[in-house]
Amino acid sequence: MSHESVWNSRPRTYGKGSRSCRVCTHSAGLIRKYGLNICRQCFREKANDIGFTKHR
């Protein structure tokens, strides 16, 4: 069995491997709250555009 035939050999329908950022398709550091599905790096860039404000 070659590497190509083993890679993605099963469908990813649940778990961390099935989800990715809707902006950059990165899968780590994903913010899923409120249905955002954005990685934390993209969230920091787009937070003001989405409507989030920083409280201090």
UniProtKB/Swiss-Prot annotation:
GO terms for molecular function: structural constituent of ribosome; zinc ion binding. Its cofactor is Zn(2+). The keyword Plastid does not apply. Zn(2+) binds at residues 21, 24, 39, 42. Disulfide bonds: none annotated. It holds the Pfam family Ribosomal_S14. InterPro entries: Ribosomal_uS14, Ribosomal_uS14_CS, RIbosomal_uS14_euk_arc, Ribosomal_uS14_sf. It is found in: Cytoplasm. PROSITE patterns: RIBOSOMAL_S14. Binds 1 zinc ion per subunit. Keywords: Cytoplasm, Metal-binding, Ribonucleoprotein, Ribosomal protein, Zinc. GO terms for cellular component: cytosolic small ribosomal subunit. It comes from the Eukaryota. Transmembrane segments: none annotated. GO terms for biological process: cytoplasmic translation. Component of the small ribosomal subunit (SSU). Mature N.crassa ribosomes consist of a small (40S) and a large (60S) subunit. The 40S small subunit contains 1 molecule of ribosomal RNA (18S rRNA) and at least 32 different proteins. The large 60S subunit contains 3 rRNA molecules (26S, 5.8S and 5S rRNA) and at least 42 different proteins. Belongs to the universal ribosomal protein uS14 family. Component of the ribosome, a large ribonucleoprotein complex responsible for the synthesis of proteins in the cell. The small ribosomal subunit (SSU) binds messenger RNAs (mRNAs) and translates the encoded message by selecting cognate aminoacyl-transfer RNA (tRNA) molecules. The large subunit (LSU) contains the ribosomal catalytic site termed the peptidyl transferase center (PTC), which catalyzes the formation of peptide bonds, thereby polymerizing the amino acids delivered by tRNAs into a polypeptide chain. This is Small ribosomal subunit protein uS14. It comes from Neurospora crassa (strain ATCC 24698 / 74-OR23-1A / CBS 708.71 / DSM 1257 / FGSC 987).
